[in-house]
Amino acid sequence: YTAKNSAVAFSVLCKLYNAANMTAELNNLVDRQLAKNPKDFLALAYRAQDIADKVSRETETQNWDPAIEAYKALLEASDGSQAFVFAGLGQCLCKKAGLIEVRAEQRALFQEALPLLEKARDLDPDNNTAWAYFLYVCYGSVFSYNDSRAIEIKEKFGF
């Protein structure tokens, strides 16, 4: 196999394992790929999404820090053109902010998420399910829900 063929084979296997709900096999494959290449974009993407999904399913305590770190590693490995990376990191930051009661700490997380979600919107304006609600919450939390940007999103998407 050439490096390109290996990447294609890895991608196909990931899709097959994911579609077949073979989580253990997928995680094992991703672990092996990251052991070979810690900056492998596709492996990091699967890892970040897997961590975020697990945190979302937690009912007692949701610790978003591992998902945030995974998405930050993915962002480092990206070329900056993938909206889902910016949206995923922005979503995780917003979800963490939603669990914090100290307003200043909460606002800081929304401020960190804001440019990420704006970038996701700019890169993929048609995929509003990935960024619109969270961007609306950021505008409302950082500025005001009466801010023209928040109002525009609310009117456009019906929040």
Give names to the regions the model predicted.
Residues A19-N21, A48-T61, G90, K95-E105, ...:
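Short coil/turn linking the two alpha-helices of tandem helical-hairpin repeats
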Residues Q111, P115, K119-F159:
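Terminal, low-structured helical/coil segments at or just beyond the last alpha-helical repeat
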